[in-house]
C-alpha cells in the first residue's frame, strides 16, 4: 500500500491574486476511502497482466461515465473529501471494459474480476450515469481544481492527475497477486509522470548486488537520503521513499579508505494460507481461504491477513412442457323406426241347445189293505204327508228350491243357462206299530217308487216350462267388440234375487186318492 503524502499546492489565479487550497491527497488516492470497498477482504488474483496496465486504465478513466471528471465527493461546509466511490467505480469499469482483454490473458482472472465488480455494485449500488453537475464558483476554485454541484446539492470536485494515478496504482496493487513480489512500497517507486515503475535494487543472501535501477547514479547508492535529481521539484506527482536506517550501508572511516560495507540481509516474504470448510447449505460446501502475508524484511515482522469471500451464483433451468387438449363434440342424429304389427285373432262361437223330451211314466198303484192294520202309519214325503196333511215343523221338512243360474264362457263366446234344482227331504221317523198290526213292505216300496218317479217327471216338466216361458237368458253370438264385457267378472253377474227362485206346486196325494186326482195334482195329463 502506498504511503500517504500530504502536499500543499499553491495555485495562482489570474489578476495577480493567489488562492491557497489544501488538498488531502491521501484520501483520494486510498481505495479504502470508499465505505463499500475494503482491499483487505479481496484476495489478489491478477498475475497475467502486463506492466503498463495502469497506463491503459488511466487513459480510459474519463471515458467511462459522465461523472468521472468530477468524482470526488466533498463536504459542503468543511470542503474536505468524503469519499471516492465514483472514482473507484470509474477505475474498475476502465479495467474491466477497456483494458483487461488487451493486457491480461487469463480467463479465470477475468471471472474473478467480474465477481469483484458485481460485489462492489451490490455494496455501493449502481451509480447514476446521467447525473447533472453544475459548475460552482468559489474561492477554492482554480485552473486545475474545480467544484461542481450535483443532485440534492451534493458537492463534487475533479481528482488531480497524481491523485488519479495513485488511486489506479493502489487499486491494481490490491488486485495483483504479490506472492512472489514485494509490497508496493518495497517493490517499486514512481519514476515518471505517467507512473511508470522500475524495480528497486535487491540484495541477495550471497552478498552480490543487482544492477542499479534506471535513473539512479552509482555515486548515490550508499546515500540513505538519496533523491532523484531528475524529478526534483515534482514531488507532488510521486511519493518519497523512506528507507530505514537498518537498510542503509554502514560507512567505515572515510580516512581509512575502506570500502562501504553492505547489508547482506535479503527481504523475505512468504504467504501462509489456511482453508476452512463450512456449509452454507445442506448440499453445497463453502471454502473460506485465510491468507497470511509475512514480511520479514522489517523488524518487527508484519503479518497481513487476507480473507477471501466467494459469491455463489445459482442458475436454475426450468423446462416448460405445453400440453394441449382438444375436446370434440359429436352430434348424434336419432333415427326412428316404426314397426307395425298386425295380429289376427279368431274366436269360435258355439251355441248349444239342449232339448229334453218328456218321458211318459205310468203310475204305479199301491193298494194298502184297509183292514189289515188297526192303525196305519203315514209316510212323510217332504212338505206333505202320505195322508195329505202338511208335515209338522219338528219333522224338519225343507221346501224344494229350484234356481236358475247364468253361465258365461268368455273363451268360447257362449252363454248357457242352466236350471239347478235342489230338493231337501227328510224321511220322518216312523212310529212304532202296535202288536197285531202289519204292513206290506212291497206295497210301501212300490208306492215310493211311484212317488219319486212322479216327482222327477214333474221337475223335468217344470224345467222345460221355465225355458219356454220364464227364461231371461238370450243366446247370442259374441264378437271381438264384446271382449271387454266378457272380462267383467264382478259379483253382479252371479247375484240372484227372488225372481230366480220358484216353488214347485207339488202335493202328495192323500190316502185313498184316485189316480185321476193324483195325476191332476201332479199336472200329468
Curated annotation (Swiss-Prot):
Keywords: Membrane, Signal, Transmembrane, Transmembrane helix
Residues annotated as transmembrane: 449-469
Topological region Extracellular: 22-448
Residues in the Cytoplasmic compartment per record: 470-525
Signal peptide interval: 1-21
Topology of the protein relative to the lipid bilayer: Single-pass type I membrane protein
Compartments (UniProt record): Membrane
Ion transport is among the record's keywords: no
One Gene Ontology term, aspect cellular component: membrane
Region (Disordered): 242-264
Name the record gives this protein: Uncharacterized protein SCY_3380
Naturally occurring in which organism (per UniProt): Saccharomyces cerevisiae (strain YJM789)
Amino acid at each position: 500500500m502506498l504511503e500517504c503524502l500530504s502536499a500543499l499546492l499553491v495555485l495562482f489565479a489570474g489578476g495577480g491574486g493567489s488562492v491557497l487550497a489544501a488538498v488531502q491527497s491521501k484520501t483520494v488516492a486510498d481505495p479504502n476511502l470508499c465505505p463499500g470497498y475494503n482491499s483487505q477482504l479481496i484476495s489478489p488474483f491478477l498475475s497475467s497482466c502486463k506492466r503498463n496496465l495502469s497506463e491503459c486504465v488511466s487513459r480510459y478513466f474519463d471515458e467511462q461515465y459522465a461523472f468521472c471528471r468530477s468524482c470526488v465527493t466533498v463536504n459542503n461546509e468543511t470542503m474536505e473529501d468524503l469519499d471516492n466511490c465514483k472514482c473507484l467505480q470509474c477505475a474498475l469499469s476502465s479495467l474491466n471494459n477497456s483494458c483487461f482483454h488487451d493486457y491480461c490473458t487469463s480467463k479465470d482472472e477475468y471471472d474473478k474480476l467480474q465477481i469483484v465488480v458485481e460485489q462492489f455494485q451490490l455494496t455501493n449500488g449502481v451509480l447514476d450515469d446521467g447525473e447533472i453537475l453544475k459548475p460552482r464558483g468559489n474561492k477554492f476554485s482554480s485552473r486545475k481544481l474545480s467544484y461542481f454541484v450535483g443532485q440534492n446539492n451534493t458537492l463534487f470536485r475533479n481528482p488531480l492527475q497524481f491523485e488519479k494515478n495513485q488511486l489506479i496504482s493502489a487499486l491494481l496493487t490490491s488486485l495483483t497477486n504479490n506472492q512472489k513480489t514485494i509490497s508496493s512500497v518495497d517493490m517499486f517507486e514512481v519514476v515518471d509522470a505517467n507512473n511508470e515503475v522500475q524495480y528497486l535494487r535487491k540484495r541477495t543472501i550471497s552478498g552480490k548486488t543487482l544492477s542499479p535501477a534506471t535513473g539512479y547514479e552509482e555515486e548515490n547508492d550508499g546515500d540513505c537520503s538519496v533523491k532523484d535529481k531528475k524529478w526534483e521539484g515534482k514531488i507532488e506527482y510521486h511519493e518519497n521513499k523512506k528507507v530505514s536506517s537498518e537498510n542503509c550501508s554502514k560507512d567505515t572511516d572515510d580516512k581509512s579508505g575502506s570500502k562501504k560495507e553492505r547489508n547482506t540481509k535479503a527481504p523475505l516474504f512468504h504467504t501462509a494460507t489456511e482453508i476452512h470448510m463450512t456449509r452454507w447449505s445442506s448440499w453445497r460446501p463453502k471454502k473460506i481461504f485465510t491468507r497470511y502475508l509475512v514480511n520479514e524484511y522489517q523488524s518487527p515482522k508484519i503479518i497481513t491477513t487476507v480473507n477471501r469471500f466467494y459469491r455463489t451464483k445459482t442458475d436454475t433451468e426450468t423446462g416448460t412442457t405445453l400440453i394441449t387438449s382438444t375436446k370434440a363434440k359429436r352430434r348424434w342424429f336419432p333415427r326412428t323406426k316404426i314397426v307395425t304389427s298386425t295380429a289376427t285373432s279368431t274366436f269360435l262361437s258355439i251355441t248349444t241347445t239342449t232339448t229334453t223330451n218328456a218321458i211318459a211314466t205310468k203310475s204305479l198303484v199301491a193298494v194298502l189293505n184297509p183292514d189289515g192294520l188297526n192303525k196305519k202309519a203315514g209316510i212323510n214325503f217332504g212338505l206333505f204327508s202320505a195322508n195329505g196333511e202338511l208335515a209338522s215343523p219338528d219333522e224338519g221338512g225343507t221346501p224344494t228350491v229350484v234356481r236358475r243360474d247364468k253361465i258365461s264362457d268368455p273363451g268360447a263366446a257362449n252363454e248357457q243357462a242352466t236350471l239347478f234344482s235342489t230338493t231337501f227331504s227328510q224321511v220322518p221317523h216312523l212310529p212304532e206299530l202296535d202288536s197285531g198290526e202289519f204292513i206290506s213292505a212291497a206295497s210301501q216300496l212300490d208306492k215310493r217308487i211311484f212317488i219319486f218317479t212322479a216327482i222327477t217327471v214333474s221337475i223335468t216338466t217344470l224345467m222345460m216350462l221355465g225355458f219356454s216361458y220364464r227364461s231371461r237368458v238370450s243366446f247370442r253370438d259374441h264378437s271381438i267388440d264384446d271382449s271387454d264385457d266378457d272380462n267383467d267378472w264382478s259379483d253382479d253377474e252371479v247375484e240372484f234375487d227372488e225372481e230366480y227362485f220358484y216353488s214347485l206346486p207339488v202335493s202328495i196325494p192323500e190316502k185313498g186318492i184316485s189316480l185321476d186326482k193324483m195325476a191332476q195334482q201332479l199336472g200329468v195329463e
